[in-house]
Amino acid sequence: AGDIEAGKAKAAVCAACHGQNGISQVPIYPNLAGQKEQYLVAALKAYKAGQRQGGQAPVMQGQATALSDADIANLAAYYASLPADGQG
């Protein structure tokens, strides 16, 4: 499991598209708050490996490439810890 506080510190870049509290204001960008931790890890690793296509995949591949495995685990832990409704 990742470090929630370390993930929070790294999340500023993510917030530009996915919202400050993990709730996106832009319909084409998914909410990250409340997502399952293992799903987020798998998704980021797939982007990093170039295994996801379509939509915003080129943007996410660029973002994920800059992340270490520890960064991915920490970001996933942070977003999984947030309430899915954006409250709290």
UniProtKB/Swiss-Prot annotation:
Pfam families referenced in this protein's UniProt entry, alphabetically: Cytochrom_C
Keywords: Electron transport, Heme, Iron, Metal-binding, Periplasm, Transport
Any coiled-coil regions, as ranges: none
Molecular function in Gene Ontology: electron transfer activity; heme binding; metal ion binding
Chief subcellular location: periplasm
Post-translational modification: Binds 1 heme c group covalently per subunit.
Location in the cell: Periplasm
UniProt-annotated binding residues for heme c: C14, C17, H18, M60
InterPro entries the record matches: Cyt_c-like_dom, Cyt_c-like_dom_sf, Cytochrome_c_Oxidase_Subunit
GO CC field: periplasmic space
Domain of life: Bacteria
Similarity comment: family membership: Belongs to the cytochrome c family.
Function: Electron donor for periplasmic nitrate reductase.
Subunit structure: Homodimer.
The protein's name in its UniProt record: Cytochrome c-552
